[in-house]
Amino acid sequence: MAKTNPGNFFEDYSIGQVLHHAVPRTVTNGERALYHALYPARHALYSSDEFARNCGLPQSPIDDLAAFHVVFGKTVPDISLNAVANLGYAEGRWLQPVYPGDTLRSESQVIGLKQNSNGKTGVVWVRTRGLNQRDEVVIEYVRWVMVRKSNLDAPAPETVVPDLKPALSVDDLVVPQGLDFSKYDFVQSGQSDRWDAYKTEETIDHVDGVTVEEAEHMLATRLWQNTAKVHFDLTTRPEGRLIYGGHVISMARALSFNGLANAQMIVGLNDGAHANPCFAGDTIKAWSQVLDKAETGVPGVGALRLRLVATKGGAPFALRGDDGKYLPDVLLDLDYWALMPI
């Protein structure tokens, strides 16, 4: 019997199947330091223990996306090792902060299956949960992936497409216990604009750009213990190593500091598309659009629903062509909720 893991293929999944992913990961300030070295992340809540304590938290949490990448990375050997593409995200929620010293593990349940008409691939929907050492859920999200079949003669499963929310409402969002922006320091945060300064449909060009390097993107992907072959093996694609989509997400979020410095905590993920592939040598820029805004149930804490778009060129705020398809320079279209002082 083979002792190596070839990964799961489409025919290996079944509705209701639960996957317990190896290996647990204790996150420390080492991950924080590397995260801030790999991305120009500057949001104050994740940079300063004193700033975080002034906002009612016990210390500075691990960056929301760093925690997401750890949880996501655990799922790759079981879900996307044989994937053709990661197709989308929905119903993502950050339920409580992750602090240095927390140990994270991941588990997923298959909630949807649909074989493609070519008979060679199919789409798998999974709901993934990240849990800490106290078995508390810290992150949950749905994603769907196109996965290859190994046995092309395997019968197609019954098609089940989950009914997912098009977007989370403000009532679905969880404000971390103790979060209090009444003593928020706008000088130290780097920007004076509060929640009420942002208007629905407003667009923000984040101006700065970062060129992706081969060594950096592979270091980042290894940091999250993401084992997907396409990110490392030069022989898997004629164009070269594909940049992990999460690398683009984190880069764009970090660039958004210039214009959204007070959008401190990501608490919801409504939708996301990796519109076009990213490769080393591409220069990532970003822009945002305010889609919605709402007051949370916590006094002084507002929520902004933001579209974050990462590009590798083209005009700011350009997204789709006349045919409705993403323009070739668009890398990422992400829809998320963030908390901001009112």
Task: Place the predicted regions along the sequence by residue.
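Short, structured motif recognition centered on aromatic/hydrophobic residues
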Residues: 35, 89, 104-108, 124-128, ...
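Short amphipathic alpha-helical patches
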Residues: 58-62, 94-99, 158, 275-279
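Hot-dog-fold acyl-thioester-processing enzymes
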Residues: 1-87, 139, 150-269, 325-333, ...
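HotDog/MaoC-like acyl-thioester-processing domains
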Residues: 1-15, 98-176, 280, 287-342
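Generic recognition of flexible, low-complexity loop/linker segments
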Residues: 238, 274, 294-295
